[in-house]
Every structure is written in C-alpha cells, then in structure tokens.
Amino acid sequence: MNDRGELFKPIKVGNMLLQHRIVHAPMTRLRATDYGKITGLMVEYYSQRSMIPGTLLIADATFVGEKSGGFPNNPRCFTKEQAESWIPLVEAVHKNKSFLFIQFWPLPGDLKDEYRNDLEKMQKITYSDCPQDPGGLPAGIHSFDAVQGVEVYKKKYMSKRDIQEHIQDFVNAADLAVNIAKADGVEIHQVNGFLLDRFVLGGFGDQCDPEYRGSIENRCRFPLEVLEAVTRKIGQERVGYRISPFSGWMQKIDFMEVNIYLMSEIAKRFPKLAYIHAIEPRKYWSGHKLVSSEQNTSFLQKYWKGPFITAGGYDPETAVQAANERGVLVAFGRNFIANPDLVFRIKHHIPLNKWDRSSFYLPKTEKGYTDYPFSKEFLQSK
C-alpha cells in the first residue's frame, strides 16, 4: 500500500522539481542565536527533515531588517554575516537533494525598546498561560498593537518613506538569501495580521500614507510592491507568497473581495511565481482542526492556476484527499516537528509520533526539536 495518489507525484515548483507534494511549513522555533544567526542545532533539524530527496522545506519565519522585528533567538537575514550563517543549513538540505525556501516575516509594527532585546520579557507576555501555534500566532494576540493586552509595538504613523524602507529590507534580505546563503528562494509572509496583512486588512486605519489605506486597491498596494521589488531582484520563480484569507478575529467584511483582488493581481503581474501558500480556515486553539470541508481556500485556485500549497490541521488522510481532489501541495507544521521522516511515514502508512506542545518555543535546546525518533522502518531502509 505504497501508492498515495497525487500526493506522491512529482511536481515542478519554480525552478525545483519536487518528488512529492508534502511541504515543511514555516514555523517560529527560537533555536537561533541571541542575535539571529543559524545554529548547528538548526542545521541538524533541517538535515533530518530533508532526508527524503525532492522535499521542499520552508524555513523558520525570519526577520528581514531591524524595522521588522528583532527579539532574540529568531533567525535574521539582513546582514552578510547572518546570511553566511545560513550556508551550512542550506548545504545540508541540498546534500540530501532537497530544497529550501526562507520565509520573510515582519512583525505588525516596531517593537518597543524594552521588548526588542529582552526575550524573557517578550516570552512572558506572548507565550505564557495561553495556547501556542508554531506557525507564529500566539493565542494572546487579539489586536494589531497588543499581545495578551500589553501594547508591545510603538505607535507611529507609517509614512511612504517607512514603507519604502520596509520594501528595501525585503529586497536586501532576498538578495542575501539567494546569492549568499544559496537558498532556493524566499517566501513572503502576509499572514494573521502581521505587517503586510495589517495593511491589507486596513489595520493602520488613518495612521499610514493615504495611498496605502481605504480602498482594496490601496490596501493591497504594499504587498504587491514588495512582490514587484523582490521578484525583480531574484526572479519570480524564486519567490513564494503566503496568505491567511480566513484570519479569524481579523476577518473584514470584504475579506473575500480583498483576497480575490490580490490573487487576481498576483496571477496577472507574477505568473511565474513559485507558488501561493494559503492557510485553511481552522479553529486555532481547539486542536487546529479544519473548520469545514465546504469553506476552504479553493476559491483562490479559480484565480491562481500555478502551484498551490495548502496548510492547516492536515493529517495523512486529509492530505491525500486534498492532493487528489484539488491538485495541491500540503504543508505540515507540528507533524513535521514530531516526525523527521514524515514523508516516509505517510507514504508507508506508518503511525506518527505525537508532538510536545510545551517544547515548541524552548530557546536554543534540542528538546522537542532534534530528539524526535525516526521510525524503525525508515532506519532499516537506509
């Protein structure tokens, strides 16, 4: 029983020929150094999970500039030294004949100074006494400015100059990721109310340049300009784009129209983009199960006809179903955390290890990171 249908058929994504359609989802794991450089622990983690040739791994949500983040132990890629620290990780993945994209993840705003470089203080607010999501959205986030009711971001007007500086950060980081670190590409993050999504959702209100607020066209201007600048620098085939059209409490009345407009513009302007990566509607804090089979991201596939990655609450059986019915790739987060040989297990119907949620965000430790076991069947196959 080794045939799992479309899920195990090769597919061309950007410049890559993948051997199956199971993708390692980008996550926040806090295993980098205090100043955002890649550690040997991270190299080991990605080496483990790339051992099935032809696997696409999307690496940790990564800061692209001082303006976009800055708290410790989260990867960064905006200096030459930071980019060089990625080289062993990328080489380990390539040695296994797999592929690596780096996700670019700007926070919703500029962190206040007291939180920027105080991991313990930020962790107490963000992750304590609340459910956790390794995709980067702690349950305590309930507004664009506050986490657990504490305002952690500076209140400031987002000027056109600020926006252009953010765009340049994306371009610089993409250049470093592809030309120094030698990653296969980058993924732009427009998810869950973080910076690009905040613009799309109108989350700055009147506190941003008039050209970037109000109408759907204006609200989508910033992410489209980011895509234009980044693809011009490194090529469309090296860029993926992640969205969360059903972002729970942030869902606007016109969210369908916004996402249809955005997807239509991306398809028109960037037809060679590597992929679109969309998060399914789900109940975030009750096990991440898919909300329904009727309401999902398939409406976006009417407008984007290229490679499409879906993520959110999948198990092996629902992944097989999605690939067969929708022709999609399927991203796994928590199951990839707990199963370094996830692709092998799914193909051969081997039960999965269960993840340990308490270890998702333990800084700089192998616990819950590189210590999950491979299946005996996988080890015997080597």
Curated annotation (Swiss-Prot):
Coiled coil: none annotated. Disulfide bonds: none annotated. Substrate binds at residues 189, 192, 361. It catalyses: A + NADPH + H(+) = AH2 + NADP(+). InterPro entries: Aldolase_TIM, OxRdtase_FMN_N, Oye-like. Pfam families: Oxidored_FMN. It comes from the Eukaryota. Its EC number is 1.6.99.1. GO terms for molecular function: FMN binding; NADPH dehydrogenase activity; oxidoreductase activity. The keyword Kinase does not apply. PANTHER family: NADH OXIDOREDUCTASE-RELATED, NADPH DEHYDROGENASE 2-RELATED. Homodimer or heterodimer. This is Putative NADPH dehydrogenase C5H10.04.
